[in-house]
Amino acid sequence: MPSLKDLRNRIASVKATQKITKAMQMVASAKLRRAQLAAEAARPYAERMDEVLASLASIVGTGPDAPKLLAGNGYDRTHLLVVCTAERGLCGGFNASIARLARDTAEKLIAEGKKVKILCVGKKGYDLLKRQFGEQILELIELRSVRTIGFVNAEAIGRKILNLYKDAEFDVCTLFFAKFRTVLHQIPTAQQLIPLAVKTQEDAPAAPPSLYEYEPSEEQILATLLPRNITIQVLRALLENAASEQGARMSAMDNASRNAGEMIKKQTLKYNRSRQAMITKELIEIISGAEAL
């Protein structure tokens, strides 16, 4: 049975941990609001880009003369998986869920005889995947020093993806991230970037079709928009990830604070019972000694 001193030290240790988890919860809560607003602001632009590209793709088609970023290079042998996770932990299963989706996808592709290459954005994804896919990981892109995710960060990643594609390093590129829904709900998502996954009529929401007139030609517009779309989709993924990370961290730290509170109650109860038993024992010894006299 632990001594009173051990119980006091244990209670003090848990209380110190609870202070840290509460502070982290408050910081995550403050960051969440900004990250959520940024993610929500990026969605309409990315969705409208999808609509315009879908309209252009329906006109141009995916024949041999179509842009490679739209129709692909005709092969499906090498896949690039761009895995976006956080730089830090203590955010529940946020990083693990994205890494798990990427791992399952990689294992399925390898089982089909495909070659897999991985580009990790965020150290935690790299840490989770390096043991199994160390040889397939091309590079780790860290954003630890970035205070606010912006277009410049996404543009650098998008440029790297495009350069790898121009160098024929892969045939298909898929982006992995977590879509933010609520503080308690983040959805691990795999989005194909190259070739462009154009929404079909069944996928599109029921709405009257929009009529567009394009100047210059559709092919010229596609040649400009397709590389930019890579950057836009990467930016959207990074912003969704940032909001999802803070939401997951806030929830995880809230649960940790609650668990610490429960542990403090249990240890305090155990401490009081031990102290009461010790006092009772001492009283019995005093009374027994008095009766002996």
Curated annotation (Swiss-Prot):
Cited InterPro entries: ATP_synth_F1_ATPase_gsu (IPR035968), ATP_synth_F1_gsu (IPR000131), ATP_synth_F1_gsu_CS (IPR023632)
Cited function: Produces ATP from ADP in the presence of a proton gradient across the membrane. The gamma chain is believed to be important in regulating ATPase activity and the flow of protons through the CF(0) complex.
MF-aspect GO terms: ATP binding; proton-transporting ATP synthase activity, rotational mechanism
Gene Ontology CC: plasma membrane; proton-transporting ATP synthase complex
Protein name: ATP synthase gamma chain
Topology in membrane: Peripheral membrane protein
Record PANTHER family: ATP SYNTHASE GAMMA CHAIN, ATP SYNTHASE SUBUNIT GAMMA, MITOCHONDRIAL
UniProt keyword terms in alphabetical order: ATP synthesis, Cell inner membrane, Cell membrane, CF(1), Hydrogen ion transport, Ion transport, Membrane, Transport
Entries under CDD domains matching the protein: F1-ATPase_gamma
UniProt-listed Pfam families: ATP-synt
Source species taxonomy: Bacteria, Pseudomonadati, Pseudomonadota, Alphaproteobacteria, Hyphomicrobiales
Family in the record: Belongs to the ATPase gamma chain family.
Gene Ontology biological-process annotations: proton motive force-driven plasma membrane ATP synthesis
Localization annotation: Cell inner membrane
Main location: membrane
Subunit comment: F-type ATPases have 2 components, CF(1) - the catalytic core - and CF(0) - the membrane proton channel. CF(1) has five subunits: alpha(3), beta(3), gamma(1), delta(1), epsilon(1). CF(0) has three main subunits: a, b and c.
SUPFAM superfamilies recorded: ATP synthase (F1-ATPase), gamma subunit
Disulfide bond sites: none
